[in-house]
């Protein structure tokens, strides 16, 4: 019994595979669209978060830091900094102190510049970082310290 691969068989494989992957694409798109609002933390966005994002952009923090894996890899990841540095309660105090003592001037170590931010700007930046830390990223980026 000899079987050969015919044009009809190839056509059936092509169309069957195409339909399968189109249906798979549509199912994954539907799933993403359905779960995205739950994962973005959009409901918790406040005016302070928006102002903090503006401070982030105006001072080009992404030029050195990454946020949720996006940005430069010169300085630590800040998407998980709230959990690493005091949690919700102590983070504003930590960030105020950290921003005030910059630059550290430690020989052989990368230095963060002094941005001369006001206390309100640092608080807004802290709110932005707290908000971004609550985005469900499916544990991305995978590193702990940044």
Curated annotation (Swiss-Prot):
Tell me, in a sentence or two, what this protein's role is: Component of the anaerobic respiratory chain that transforms nitrate to dinitrogen (denitrification).
**Listed name of the protein:** Nitric oxide reductase subunit C
Q: What switches on its expression?
A: By nitric oxide.
Organism placement in taxonomy: Bacteria, Pseudomonadati, Pseudomonadota, Gammaproteobacteria, Pseudomonadales
GO molecular function per UniProt: electron transfer activity; heme binding; metal ion binding
Classification via SUPFAM superfamilies: Cytochrome c
Subcellular location as annotated: Cell membrane
Q: Which PANTHER family match?
A: CYTOCHROME C-553-LIKE
What species was this sequence derived from? Answer: Pseudomonas aeruginosa (strain ATCC 15692 / DSM 22644 / CIP 104116 / JCM 14847 / LMG 12228 / 1C / PRS 101 / PAO1)
UniProtKB keywords? Cell membrane, Electron transport, Heme, Iron, Membrane, Metal-binding, Respiratory chain, Signal-anchor, Transmembrane, Transmembrane helix, Transport
Q: Which Pfam families would you find in this protein's record?
A: Cytochrom_C
- Record membrane topology: Single-pass membrane protein
Q: Which chain regions cross the lipid bilayer?
A: 13-29
Which positions in this protein are listed as binding heme c?
A: 61, 64-65
What's a single GO CC term here?
plasma membrane
Its assembly, as annotated, is: Heterodimer of cytochromes b (large subunit) and c (small subunit).
